[in-house]
Amino acid sequence: MSRVRRVLCRACLALAAVLAVLLLLPLPLPLPLPLPRAPAPDPGRVPTGSLTLEVSRLQPDDVFIAVKTTRKNHGPRLRLLLRTWISRAPRQTFIFTDGDDPELQLLAGSQMINTNCSAVRTRQALCCKMSVEYDKFIESGRKWFCHVDDDNYVNPKSLLHLLSTFSSNQDIYLGRPSLDHPIEATERVQGGGTSNTVKFWFATGGAGFCLSRGLALKMSPWASLGSFMSTAERVRLPDDCTVGYIVEGLLGARLLHSPLFHSHLENLQKLPSGAVLQQVTLSYGGPENPHNVVNVAGSFSIRQDPTRFQSVHCLLYPDTHWCPMKNRGKEAFQ
């Protein structure tokens, strides 16, 4: 009996020793939880990441503003632009025309570019000028390309402020569509008789639009060195539509709609007078619709300033030498 008791005691001691060892061992760590995954990018969302550095660095000379005009408009339209907003952005602005003009060349210098495109307002002539604009921008090395027409007033400060909220390395296509729905076009497939239907948004050139350098470089296979014109023939559309076709239809990027761009196609009198000076571009109706102008007062009558561009300019830059002194007073809006 005592022998059995001794065996049991030894067993108990051995068990106690094992338990003691187990208690001294470190507890196993729990398995690590899986790292949270970043949400998938939303294709419709405006990219906003890592913009602080670019905002602080964006300078006026980072922007390439292309003004499309024609020889017959050098007098009535272009001189007004040179007198107003271009005088505040001379190094940013490049004038693309279709005829030599020694007098204008003296005013604009090397910023005036004769595209040698046809002066007839056809789809092919418009695309010819856009092709030259694109190539000159790529050659310039600047960060942003902005296209406007010769009936646009550009507010350089508002433009720079808007572009500073984006990165030029990202795919940015910024402007205002003239339609409330995507355009539908027939895309002719090269090397065959087949065709496809494509739908895409485009920013109307009459209001102006901007492209980041990152996106413009991706457009190169369809836009550089004359390729733009052959691309336009695939859909048989004018220049601004072709830009939208390349960006949305071929590259899969998206137009970012902005209400700050304005063309003569909209009712400009509906633009609140208090918001006029914050817009990026303005326009006017012209002889066929002379009353379609922004509602802004000032020191010039409608007869003196039918486009209202001089009035807008003097409100933005009252120190301009030809602006009336009273324009520097209190309120100028109606």
Curated annotation (Swiss-Prot):
Gene3D superfamilies xrefs: 3.90.550.50
Keyword field contains Manganese: yes
Cofactor note: Has some activity with cobalt but not with magnesium, calcium and zinc.
Biological processes annotated in GO: cell differentiation; negative regulation of Notch signaling pathway; nervous system development; pattern specification process; positive regulation of Notch signaling pathway; regulation of Notch signaling pathway
InterPro entries, per the entry: Fringe, Fringe-like_glycosylTrfase
Subcellular location: Golgi apparatus membrane
Active-site residue list: 240
The keyword Nucleus is annotated on this UniProt entry: no
Role according to the record: Glycosyltransferase that initiates the elongation of O-linked fucose residues attached to EGF-like repeats in the extracellular domain of Notch molecules. Modulates NOTCH1 activity by modifying O-fucose residues at specific EGF-like domains resulting in enhancement of NOTCH1 activation by DLL1 and JAG1. Inhibits Notch signaling in postmitotic neurons of the brain. It may play a role in adult brain and in neurogenesis. It may play a role in limb development.
PANTHER family (UniProt xref): FRINGE-RELATED
Protein name: Beta-1,3-N-acetylglucosaminyltransferase radical fringe
Underlying gene: Rfng
